[in-house]
Amino acid sequence: MAPSVTIKTVAQAVGVSPSTVSNAYNKPGQLSGALRDRILAKAQELGYAGPDASARALRSGKAGAVGVLFTDKLAYAFSDPYAVGFLAGLAEVAEEFVTSLLLMPLSSSDIEGGANAVRQASIDGAAIFCVATGHPGLDMLGKRGIPTVSTARDADPKSSWVAIDEQEAAAKLGHHLARLGHSDLVVLVDNTEAPGSRPVELTFDEVGCNDCEWRIRGLQRELPGARIRLVSGGANAFSSGLRGAELVLDSQDRPTAIIGLSDVQALGAMEAMKTRRLVPGRDLTVVGFDDIPAAETAGLTTIRQPIKDKGRTVGRVLLDPEFTEHQVLLPTELIVRSSSGPAPH
């Protein structure tokens, strides 16, 4: 059996110390370009296990990966229909440019750990997907000079984003509900700080999600005289919508309409109605946001946004040198189905 090639083998072949070989990979700035290239070439010639990917990265100055940052657990990226659609679109473009995706969940309970993860990540760019405003991980990206594209609009003309007009989209829902005569509403809000098993009412200041805040403002604009309560059953999930709806449906102060700020929460609310033998659109209106595939099956009135196209466009802004736009506003559409109806008298 041939002896394994180690860092010492490479060092002896080049005539340098093992630490110098290590610097060629970890601290390239400490070596001259000629020496670094000589070490990398010899390592590849000897078949040193491990230098190939690092050598390519050093020569090109590219990590070959884009980070996807989101404030939730890792499982969210694989279970939430909106996240799955967005990542599918982003992955199509990443594959075209031979780039990997690095999923980076930034836990709201471990702020420092999230910032450290961003500090250490080997990425060429970052897609900011559903990250809490002000998270230190975002500041760390700026300090590292890593290009970013957000899915939230930013007033800074130098920022890059691919987004919808959250307020105008929600205003379409609000206008629809106002025409149906609704004036007592509950909004189901995702909130990772809320208890996992007990739904709670929130104030506007407790929402903590920039997109959610704009959607609530859009509803308020079209329903100026309405009573609008905010309820959270936890993070953005079917179970959270179920818990939040159960709280209001079992109270003596039942609203005439429930608005899920995502379809998954609205679908959870419809399940809560089903177990109480209530019919959406007749006994109580339920509407959502996103138009995921399950929304059509359930007959859910919602706002359609181009989820997969959003992911594709984020990928273009990050990776495609021929794509010159850096701020892209995507269209939305009100989709009316059977879950919305006139307010009961």
Question: Predicted segment positions?
Answer:
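Alpha-helical recognition/docking segments in bacterial nutrient-uptake
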Residues: M1-T6, T20, A65-V68, K73-A178
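Short acidic/polar active-site loop segments enriched in Thr and Asp
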Residues: S17, G64, D124, H182-D184, ...
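Glycine-rich phosphate-binding loop signature in dinucleotide/nucleotide-binding domains
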Residues: L46, L180-H182, V248-R254
